[in-house]
UniProtKB/Swiss-Prot annotation:
This is 8-amino-7-oxononanoate synthase 1. It comes from Polaromonas sp. (strain JS666 / ATCC BAA-500). Substrate binds at residues 29, 141, 368. Catalyzes the decarboxylative condensation of pimeloyl-[acyl-carrier protein] and L-alanine to produce 8-amino-7-oxononanoate (AON), [acyl-carrier protein], and carbon dioxide. The lineage of its organism: Bacteria, Pseudomonadati, Pseudomonadota, Betaproteobacteria, Burkholderiales. It catalyses: 6-carboxyhexanoyl-[ACP] + L-alanine + H(+) = (8S)-8-amino-7-oxononanoate + holo-[ACP] + CO2. Homodimer.
């Protein structure tokens, strides 16, 4: 057969039809070209928008001090690590950042990764494997789910935040090694896990707790030190049964992620995490920017105070504005404020209605959320103003009225 002879009935011919099916189900996703502007504004496909979609919770991503620190790091170290951390990619800046991160979250040791998703899909298989057991909250982020699948351990998926059901699963499992994995702040609902209760279960059933604090680091706890500090479980009260993970591209405003825990746990992960061992290290310029970010997170309490006022203002406004509507505002104390619309097409219509008003709020649809719970995921930032919140509340109040869409 000639190399260029076209095949008939190839499975490769299925992709156009499969993409069309995504369109029919209102599930096709499209990237938008964005350019950051002042405050919480973006240019989205050339249109200036007030954005409520970024995880830049403290408004640090464009901070001049971080930009300067990154430039200084680039001049000192170049723009690429050019090797994995275990070869020659572990810079002095990355080493200093790991020490700073461990101190910041009150844990003995930290390990810095280039991305959050890569962290979780790597550390879970490094901790447990065939014959072991993982207990996963039903609403965990995809990276925890994928890490569990890659581990080959038996996966027990318990109903969201149902710790009684979790304990029954722990009791029933014959596995010697048990790993509980949970978001600390759930990314699509904004609620906070009951970390003390999860830790108590670990102590009763000889389990390890892996907490993904992607959306709590920098925001929760004294000086933004995260969910463990929020619950008084860091520093002198740190437990060897907790492995803490957080990302550095959200409230910290830069990129990357880290894990923190006991010396032995972190050393094991350094030795066995494939997504760490076989990947090029994060550029040192990011580490220099992150050290500056940690200083700002610690000292700028006004950012968290302002954010809390915005959360309260939004919730108060929507509690009134959505009265009589079928839409539901989720019970969230954090910067993630979900408005559950229901059908995919309805959520997209609301998103479009906001876009025509100069507001950018993405519609989140399956498989990110369950069928029938398509929603607006409103993400608030210290970069927003009270006037920004009022503008969003007014727009949603108008769109929630019958016949407005």
């Amino acid at each position: 057969m000639a190399i260029n002879t076209p095949l008939t009935n190839s499975w490769l011919d299925e992709f156009p039809a499969r993409i069309a099916e995504l369109d029919r189900a209102h599930l096709r996703r499209r990237r938008r070209v964005v350019v950051p502007e002042d405050g919480a504004h973006l240019q989205v496909d050339g249109q200036r928008m007030l954005a409520f979609c970024s995880n830049d919770y403290l408004g640090l991503a464009g901070h001049p001090a971080l930009v300067q620190a990154a430039c200084d790091g680039a001049r000192a170290f170049g723009v690429g690590a050019a090797a994995s951390p275990l070869v020659s990619g572990h810079s002095a800046a990355n080493e200093a950042l790991e020490a700073a991160l461990a101190r910041f979250v009150g844990q003995p040791r930290a390990l810095y990764f280039y991305a959050g998703y890569a962290t979780n899909i790597g550390i879970v298989p490094a901790l447990v494997g065939k014959g072991d057991a993982i207990f996963s909250d039903a609403l965990n982020h995809a990276c925890l789910i994928d890490g569990a699948r890659l581990s080959s351990a038996q996966i027990h998926r318990y109903p969201h935040a149902d710790l009684a059901a979790l304990e029954q699963e722990l009791i029933s499992s014959p596995a010697r090694r048990k790993l509980i994995i949970s978001d600390a702040v759930f990314s699509m609902d904004g609620d906070v896990a009951d970390v003390p209760a999860l830790l108590a279960l670990c102590e009763r059933h000889d389990a390890l707790l892996l907490l993904d604090d992607a959306h709590g680091f920098g925001v929760l706890g004294p000086q933004g030190r995260g969910c463990l500090a929020h619950f008084g479980l860091s520093g002198e009260n740190a437990s060897p049964r907790v492995l803490y993970m957080a990302t550095l591209g959200k409230a910290a405003g830069v990129a990357g992620a880290f894990v923190a825990g006991s010396e032995a746990l972190v050393e094991w992960l350094l030795q066995k995490t494939r997504s760490y061992i076989f990947a090029t290290a994060a550029p040192a310029l990011l580490a220099t920017a992150l050290q500056t970010s940690l200083q700002l997170i610690e000292q700028d309490e006004w950012r968290r105070e302002h954010l809390q006022r915005l959360i309260a203002r939004l919730r108060s406004g929507l509690a009134q504005g959505l009265q009589g509507s079928s839409w539901r505002l989720g019970e969230s104390p954090t910067a993630i404020q979900p408005v559950v619309i229901g059908p995919n097409d309805a959520a997209l219509a609301v998103m479009e209605g906001l876009r025509t008003r100069g507001l950018w709020v993405p519609a989140i649809r399956p498989p990110t959320v369950a069928e029938g719970t398509a929603r607006l995921r409103i993400a608030l930032s210290a970069a927003h103003t009270e006037a920004d919140i009022d503008r969003l509340v007014q727009a949603l109040t108008e769109l929630a009225k019958p016949g407005s869409l």
